[in-house]
From Swiss-Prot:
Coiled-coil boundaries: 792-812, 850-870, 1026-1046, 1098-1118, 1150-1177, 1362-1389, 1451-1514, 1591-1611
Main location: cytoplasm
Name used for this protein in its record: Cilia- and flagella-associated protein 43
Keyword list, A-Z: Cell projection, Coiled coil, Cytoplasm, Cytoskeleton, Repeat, WD repeat
Gene Ontology, cellular component aspect: axoneme; extracellular region
InterPro entries for this protein: WD40/YVTN_repeat-like_dom_sf, WD40_repeat_dom_sf, WD40_rpt
Length: 1621
């Protein structure tokens, strides 16, 4: 490629990221698009582009202060790049900050800092110094994925991160060179403006009063939570939907304004995290409406000096002024589209507004009426783009929503647009006329007139398919339009507008159409077409790959198309010379080469390009099996799409890697390549050449970018480009006349409408209507009606109509023959019915179509089998469910649940359904019982050993025994009457000693056993009553039979009372199905029918025999009631017979009858009362369970407090270590600061000593100048500035600039003109150096003072945190101690159940003398009735709650199963994707390609063995050499050791002699050195004096020379003498 001399470059890029548009300076807007950053100058309209060469751009940010742009690439371990504007110089690369991708990046406004946030999987917030490319600090937060990141413009130490569920303010704290991030989460209010109830640390309050409910516990302890979950737990009933932040911005007071998805605006203090909901003054009193400022979602905000700009889904830009918690709407501007983002320019005079449809407006803040639309680009994924005609002026693009837009090829400006409001699926531009064809998902083709580029329009619509159009292709000369779809039909249309885009016909291919390619030849007057097809069904299995189907379209077809098609519109294969070719590899894309003698394809399985040559055999017929003659490397990621240049010399390859490769077809080598799109988004979607080959336009997959490429001008590539240009010019000249004619015809065509289309159809006399489509600017798709038929369907109807007319006579003859044949067969069937059985024929003998009958029979059998299988499966599932329910609710029950109902009153008493006690329960009960016995024996023994028994006299023994008997018999302290109903309470603990947890649990086990015994006793009584009722019903039935006989004899017709058992009394009925319950007639086989008839006859015989006179039975009925012996229990039952007066109304009863009725009711009522006898034992269990529950809550709270204490202690240790470490750093830095201040003071004090060689007057003058400092002018903000943030804090750059200004001012002060009188120049120069040194020290002191103050503030915060941690630990310790005391008090304050006499009510005596003036005396039966009603309603409510709970559980179970299946589906998809992307290594390829792989491996092993042997020999030689060298070195070391010992001895002697000589010198040479020093000082003074005199003389000479220079300069000035005219 380097030798080709050709290179591509980006001409322009179009597309916009709607949420990332911002200013980089006052007149330049920038935004990311694909893997480009686009910069647009709003003044000149010029474009510039910055490309991300490593992939698609991810996060994006701009610093207007430094005019730099930062963006991240999308790859593994991404990098953040920082570039300058407009030079695009790389300033920094920030690496190792994320693993997968950066979600957000943001610049600080003044300081050289950048914040980045990476989401999954690390969730890390990192602060960078982008100028030095180093990370300063980072913090991980794995619980939240944030969506917005901003720095505080007034304080770079603060930044804010927000997501849809949370908002966090981060503080950057600095201590010298160490940085730390501290998070301050903000508690968001609910949507109605209230905040959730926060869980407080409720301290247990000590109290002397006994509380039945125990100490007050927080909700988390009641829920049983311990740990971090308890800190954030809020009960479900107290939870409220909080606001959802969507965007935030800072104001000038360092507060935050937050816009929410529900239309609320919040004001948050960054220091205190206090949240205020802003509301308008004039809103209604409704609290919810007051908290909602805008209808719909607030998507973006921007703060200005005049107020807050807010925009969102409503498409209106609002300006609010805020005062306190109230806002006022000042102004608004309607964009008529949902607004996605807004951004101010650095001067805050212009606001950029980006809408969801891709429009970019520039809003003038001072003059809103001057707002104009800067851009109008695609808002969705691009479908395709192509050049109009020659391709040197305009190109046309379409997105998937049917939005058509025209662009200028020269500069990329948007010319016009047209919204079709359809789902576009394909697009192509005609090379011979200025129009485009767009295919839709409904199978329609829309023809767009672009002659007037400023106003494109729809001129015609044609429906060809019932499925979406997938392919559209024009031949190179614009004569034919070819379309393809999934139904395997290729339609050929006349592409000339003068013929109204006439449909010429269609062909059907053998499979799915992959690509279409054509080649026109002016010599042969025909067009070669090739379709790449993927066969389906059997053909695919036979061929195993793709096929090439080629056919020819002669130009003569345009004038007489009917000669080439049949009556149904299908082309004849012989007329178009259709032929198919098989290729050796499956292809994804293919194009025809020059003269259609070669085919180029891109493999579907590999990233290779293949060249096929079409040959002919000896007989002259073409070879249908093609083998690749040349294979070259394609793109990096496949598969790819191929596109030929118009002059057929180049081929462009575009794949998923996003790179455009241009190859020379002569040698298949790459001429040029350029990265246009990112492989992360899917690479390139479409590519097109201009007619002269000078431009290429590409669209990306899912990145919304439209890229136009051009060739770089160079001498080496001019010849190739010239050939393409010449071909384009020649083709344009040949098509110019036709183009002019067709454009005129296109201009004459009216605008297409649905009404005009329908009228046109009616004029042609057709009986089908057209589709009604509303092509407006709204986002609505057309509704396809049933009458909107396709072209092929109309052709079929016309052909059928012609065939019907042509063969009408033949059809009539056939119909007449069929009628005669039917009559003959019917006569034969009637004759067959009259024949004897032996001569009759079967019915099927008269069936003429046995095959159809057999088919129908088989279909019916299949359907019956399917239905039978479904019914069997359904029955099987129901049987399984029945068995499960029966096992759980019936078989496992030792005592089945049932009831007994009174005959007349409706009273119903239920027994206790009981399961068998498990061995574990019995073992547990036995263990507790043995424990009780052991404790009783132990207590008895201890009492005998320890206690002294008092002596009891004989007179007192009887009293003691009586008291013991009373205590044993009394059940008051036991708390129930369970021992009267089968329960043994002798083994229970006393209620007054239940303190420990184990005792309470053992008591519950014993009480459960007592309840079990009570239930068993009750069930026995219940069974007795049930048997009595059965006997009573049997007796009544016998009586009824006798009464029935008497009534028959007396001819009476009265209804008798026939008592029966209800379903609750006989629950086993639910397990069987009675024949009466089956509503469908039972199917019986012939054998079963015969058996049923026999049984019916037997029953009838029995009934007739029973009707005969039976004297014995009648005698028994008359004398003894139908029995031979009257049993005793029957007599007892007869004591309370059923009253006969129940048939009368209650008003007719006598007093005696009422008395009898009450006695009759008593029995059932007693049974119902016995049911409540065990409730007292259950009350005791509930009390114990309640105490255990409270104790569990206390233990949970204690465990949580212990967890918090442990956590706080660890944090306290950490804070203590941090304080200790930073305190030492601060002390060390303070020491260095004090030293620097001391040095600075020493400079001040030593000034006069340094200039002691001059007079005191001169020293004073110099000292004043020494203290003088120049004034540095500062740039102040203008009073009329619209910037809301004013003067921001100084940055490091500003400080450096101020130092530079100071030094520049010092240079002016150091000039010789400022030398005081009498001071010599050398002294002045020395003074200037001293003053500069003093200033440098002062600046260092200032810097260190600021750093020290910052470090001290940091240390104070850490000390404050450490103290707060200590205080928290003390508070929690105190709360824990109080809670333990409360626990002990609660364990000792027992709840005891006493048994009171029935009918007594205990009242609290609040006064000394109780007053009963307002009291009412009620009978206990009233209260009992009320209680029974309440209890019944409570049971109903509990039943409904249980049913609701079970239903919710079922929903949750289904949701979990759904999620499980979804996850399994995702796992399977991932496995499938991994299998499809399985990488085949080079070794596998060698193994597969090598025929004798074992021989190859043996040869390699032999070579390796020889190599190893050679290396071993060489290694042995090297070892010997190294051993020899080592031996020599050891000998040399020994010699050196001996020499060093000798030198040590000499050194000791030299040291002794040196010390002796030094001592002599110190004694003798002091006086000589003093005299010598004085003499040297004197000579220095003399020399200095001479130098001063010389400097004065030279200064005088310089002064004289300067005066002479000034005099000579004045002579050279021109003399301007006023002249008179």
């Amino acid at each position: 490629m380097e030798n080709s001399g050709c290179a591509l470059e980006v001409r322009w890029v179009q597309g916009i990221n709607k949420k990332k548009v911002t200013f980089i300076n006052d007149h330049t807007v920038c935004y990311p698009c694909g893997n480009f950053i686009v910069f647009h100058d709003t003044n000149t309209g010029k474009w510039s582009f910055l490309q991300c060469t490593t992939g698609s751009t991810g996060a994006f940010a701009v610093n207007t202060y430094s005019e730099v742009v930062a963006f991240s690439d999308q790859k593994l371990h991404p990098t953040i790049y920082v570039y300058t504007f407009p030079g695009f110089v790389k300033r920094a690369e920030l690496k190792d900050g994320a693993q997968l991708d950066y979600s957000l990046i943001a610049f600080s406004h003044a300081a050289p800092y950048l914040a980045s946030y990476s989401s999954i999987p690390d969730h890390v917030l990192t602060i960078w110094n982008w100028q030095e490319s180093i990370p300063l600090c980072s913090k991980s937060d794995s619980q939240t994925t944030y969506t917005t990141l901003t720095f505080n413009p007034m304080n770079w130490h603060q930044l804010c991160l927000s997501s849809e569920r949370s908002l966090t303010v981060w503080n950057i704290e600095i201590c010298d060179n160490q940085y730390q991030l501290k998070a301050m989460p903000v508690k968001l209010p609910s949507e109605d403006g209230t905040t959730d109830i926060e869980e407080e640390n409720l301290n247990s309050h000590t109290s002397n009063s006994v509380s039945y409910y125990g100490p007050l516990m927080p909700t988390s302890a009641v829920a049983g939570l311990v740990g971090d979950e308890a800190e954030i737990f809020i009960p479900k009933e107290q939870r409220k939907h909080s606001v959802q932040p969507s965007f935030h911005c800072w104001n000038a007071t360092s507060d935050l304004y937050v816009g929410c998805a529900g239309g609320q605006i919040l004001s948050i203090s960054a220091e205190t995290q206090k949240v205020t909901i802003l509301a308008q003054k004039d809103q209604s009193a409704d609290h919810l409406s007051r908290t909602t400022l805008l209808e719909g979602n607030i998507k973006t905000m921007a703060f200005h000096k005049e107020g807050l700009y807010v925009a969102g889904n409503d498409g209106v830009l609002h300006l609010f002024t805020i005062k306190g918690s109230e806002v006022k709407l000042e102004d608004s501007w309607n964009a008529q589209e949902p607004i996605d983002s807004i951004s101010f320019s650095p001067s805050y005079k212009t606001l950029s507004i980006t809408t969801s449809k891709g429009s970019l407006y520039l809003y003038n803040q001072r003059n809103p009426e001057e707002t104009y639309k800067l851009l109008n680009v695609y808002s969705r994924d691009l479908l395709a783009a192509d050049f109009l005609t020659f391709g040197n002026k305009y190109c046309l693009g379409t997105d998937i929503s049917g939005h058509v837009q025209l662009w200028s090829v020269e500069d990329g400006k948007s010319v016009s647009s047209l919204n079709l409001n359809i789902q576009a699926t394909a697009m192509a531009c005609c090379p011979s006329s200025n129009y485009a064809a767009v295919g839709s998902s409904t199978g329609h083709i829309y023809f767009i007139d672009a002659v007037k580029t400023e106003a494109p329009r729809i001129v015609q619509r044609t429906r060809l398919y019932c499925v979406p159009v997938q392919h559209m292709h024009f031949d190179p000369r614009g004569n034919f339009l070819l379309t393809g779809a999934a139904d395997r039909h290729i339609f050929i249309l006349d592409a000339r507008p003068s013929y109204s885009f006439q449909v010429l016909g269609y062909i059907v291919v053998c499979g799915e159409i992959l690509t279409l390619s054509s080649l026109s030849s002016a010599d042969t007057q025909q067009t070669k077409v090739m379709a790449l097809v993927c066969p389906v069904d059997e053909r695919k299995e036979e061929k195993g790959g793709t096929q090439l189907e080629m056919f020819s379209l002669p130009l003569q077809m345009l004038s007489s198309p009917s000669e080439y098609i049949d009556e149904r519109g299908m082309f004849k294969d012989t007329m178009i010379q259709k032929i198919s070719y098989d290729v050796d590899q499956p292809l994804f894309s293919a194009v025809m080469g020059y003269n259609s003698s070669s085919v180029f394809g891109y493999s579907s399985n590999e990233t290779i390009l293949l060249k096929y040559v079409i040959h002919k055999d000896i007989s002259g017929s073409p070879v249908t099996a093609l083998v690749a003659e040349k294979v070259v490397r394609g793109s990096q990621l496949g598969p790819g799409v191929l596109c030929l240049s118009p002059h057929l010399k180049w081929m462009a390859v575009s794949g998923r890697d996003g790179i455009v490769y241009v190859k020379d077809l002569l040698n298949m080598e790459t001429m040029a390549q350029l990265q246009c799109h990112s492989y992360h988004n899917g690479g390139i979607n479409s590519l097109a050449f201009s007619l002269d080959g000078q431009s290429i336009v590409t669209t990306g997959t899912c990145d919304g970018a439209l890229v136009c490429l051009q060739w770089k001008s160079s001498g080496r590539s001019s010849s190739r480009l010239g050939l393409a240009g010449e071909y384009g010019k020649d083709l344009a000249l040949s098509l110019q006349a036709a183009m002019k004619e067709e454009d005129q015809a296109l201009s004459r065509m009216p605008v297409w409408t649905a009404d005009a289309d329908s009228l046109g159809v009616e004029r042609k006399g057709k009986e089908y209507s057209q589709l009604s489509v509303d092509v407006t600017e709204q986002d609505s798709f057309p509704n396809t009606s049933a009458n909107d038929v396709t072209w092929i369907k109309r052709k079929l109807e016309e052909a059928e109509k012609k065939e019907t007319e042509k063969y009408a006579a033949e059809k009539e003859v056939i119909k007449t023959g069929i009628k005669k044949l039917r009559k003959t067969i019917q006569a034969m069937m009637r004759e067959n019915e009259s024949l004897p059985d032996i001569e009759k024929l079967d019915q099927q003998e008269f069936n003429l179509d046995t095959e159809e009958q057999e088919r129908l029979y088989l279909d019916s059998e299949k359907e019956v089998a399917r239905v039978r299988q479904e019914i069997e499966l359904e029955n099987l599932s129901k049987q399984y469910l029945r068995e499960v329910i029966k096992q759980e609710c019936w078989d496992s029950m030792a005592v089945k649940g049932r009831s007994v109902t009174a005959f007349h009153t409706g009273y119903e008493v239920m027994n206790y359904p009981m399961k068998e006690r498990t061995p574990k329960e019995l073992e547990k009960f036995a263990r507790v019982l043995n424990l009780m016995k052991i404790e009783a024996v132990d207590l008895k023994v201890r009492k005998e050993i320890v206690e002294t028994q008092p002596k009891i006299g004989p007179d007192d023994e009887e009293e003691v025994e009586e008291e013991l008997m009373k205590c044993q018999d009394s059940s008051s302290l036991v708390g129930s009457l369970s021992d009267h109903y089968g329960g043994d309470t002798s083994c229970l603990y006393s209620q007054l000693i239940l303190h420990s947890r184990e005792e309470k649990i053992n008591q519950i086990i014993l009480l459960q056993d007592i309840i079990q015994n009570i239930k068993n006793a009750f069930n026995k009584d219940f069974d007795t009553v049930c048997r009595q009722k059965e006997q009573e019903i049997t007796r009544v039935m016998e009586r009824n039979n006798r009464i029935q006989e008497i009534m028959v004899e007396l001819n009476l017709q009265e209804k008798l009372l026939e008592p029966t058992f209800t379903d609750n009394e006989k629950p086993e009925r639910a397990l069987t199905v009675d024949d009466s319950e089956v509503k469908v007639e039972r199917y019986l086989t012939p054998e079963q029918k015969a058996k049923a008839e026999h049984l019916a006859k037997v029953e009838e015989a029995k009934r007739l025999a029973a009707q005969e006179d039976n004297a014995k039975q009648r005698a028994l009925d008359d004398m003894m009631g139908g029995v031979l012996e009257v049993k005793k229990e029957d007599i007892l039952r007869m004591e309370v017979p059923q009253p006969v007066f129940l048939a009368r109304t209650e008003a007719e009863w006598t007093e005696e009858e009422k008395k009898q009725f009450k006695e009759y009711e008593k029995k059932c009522k007693d049974l119902s009362e016995e049911k409540e006898k065990y409730s007292k034992e259950e009350l005791k269990i509930n009390n114990l369970l309640f105490s255990l529950l409270i104790e569990e809550e206390i233990n949970t709270r204690v465990a949580h407090l212990a967890y918090i204490l442990d956590k706080k202690r660890k944090q306290k240790n950490q804070t203590a270590e941090i304080v200790k470490s930073f305190k030492s750093q601060v002390m060390a830095f303070r020491e260095s600061y004090d030293n620097l201040v001391a040095e600075d003071k020493l400079l001040d004090r030593g000034f006069k000593k340094e200039f002691s060689d001059i007079t005191s007057y001169q020293v004073d003058q110099l000292y004043k100048l020494y203290k003088r400092r120049p004034r540095v002018q500062r740039l102040r903000t203008q009073a009329d500035s619209t910037a809301p943030f004013g003067e921001r804090p100084g940055s490091a750059k500003a400080y450096k600039d101020s130092i530079a200004l100071l030094m520049h001012a010092m240079d002016e002060l150091d000039t010789p003109e400022n030398v005081p009188e009498g001071v010599e120049l050398p002294v002045w120069q020395r003074f200037c150096l001293a003053r500069r040194s003093k200033i440098e020290y002062e600046q260092q002191v200032k810097i260190k003072a600021l750093v020290l103050a910052e470090m001290q503030a940091f240390l104070d915060k850490r000390i404050e945190e450490d103290e707060k941690m200590r205080q928290d630990i003390e508070n929690f310790m105190q709360e824990l101690n109080v809670l333990r005391n409360e626990k002990m008090k609660f364990q000792l304050d027992l709840t005891v159940q006493f048994l009171l006499k029935q009918g007594q009510v205990e009242l609290e005596n609040t006064d000394l003398i109780p007053s009963f003036e307002d009291a009412i005396l009620l009978h206990r039966s009233v209260i009992e009735d009320l209680n029974s009603t309440i209890k019944g309603l409570g049971e109903q409510k509990i039943a409904s709650m249980v049913e609701s709970k079970d239903f919710r559980k079922g929903i949750f179970q289904l949701e979990w199963e759904h999620r499980k299946i979804r996850m399994e589906m995702e796992d399977l998809e991932k496995k499938s994707r991994d299998i499809s992307l399985l990488h085949v290594s080079k070794e596998f390829q060698v193994f597969l390609n090598e025929q004798n792989y074992d021989k190859r491996m043996s040869d390699q092993i032999q070579v390796l063995e020889e190599t190893i042997n050679a290396q071993e020999k060489q290694h042995g030689k090297n070892v010997k050499t190294y051993k020899k060298i080592l031996k020599d070195l050891e000998t040399h070391i020994n010699k050196k050791i001996i020499a060093n010992l000798e030198l040590d001895k000499d050194l000791q002697e030299l040291l002794v002699s040196f010390s002796e000589r030094k001592h002599i010198y110190d004694v003798v040479g002091v006086e000589q050195s003093t005299e010598k020093a004085a003499k040297e000082r004197y000579m220095e003074i003399i020399q200095r004096r001479k130098l001063v005199d010389l400097a004065k003389i030279q200064a005088q000479e310089i002064h004289e020379l300067r005066s002479e220079v000034d005099r000579l300069r004045m002579k050279t000035f021109p003399a301007l003498v006023q002249m008179e005219y």
